[in-house]
């Protein structure tokens, strides 16, 4: 995976906050580690929807909240959009992966 190139792109070209860039980099490194642990191909063009879906399921089983998982999905979605624009991949594995539903929060007035 081209995580370093992507984070530099976010920082210098897209002008993302350093905290966001660090979080996205961490999320992508975690995903790459998951692929390695599952003995799945970690090359950008070889990553498919099933690998992404397996990671999302793994995160939920680890107790992550839907909002935390959605942030990680957002990092992957941005990464694969970056690769598409650079011509490194032809199809994004994120095309079928939507965000998780989050519980509706209501505020009670005082």
Residue ranges and their predicted role:
Residues 4-19, 25-106:
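N-terminal core-binding DNA-recognition domain of tyrosine recombinases/integrases
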Residues 109:
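Juxtacatalytic substrate-recognition/specificity segment
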């Amino acid at each position: 995976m081209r995580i370093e190139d992507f984070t530099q792109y976010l920082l210098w070209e897209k002008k993302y906050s350093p905290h966001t860039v660090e979080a996205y980099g961490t999320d992508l490194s975690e995903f790459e580690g998951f692929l390695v642990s599952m003995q799945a191909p970690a090359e950008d063009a070889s990553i498919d929807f099933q690998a992404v879906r397996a990671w999302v399921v793994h995160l939920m089983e680890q107790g992550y909240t839907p909002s935390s998982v959605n942030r990680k999905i957002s990092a992957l979605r941005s990464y694969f959009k970056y690769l598409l624009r650079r011509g490194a991949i032809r199809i994004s594995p994120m095309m079928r992966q939507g965000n998780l539903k989050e519980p509706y929060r209501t505020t009670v007035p005082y």
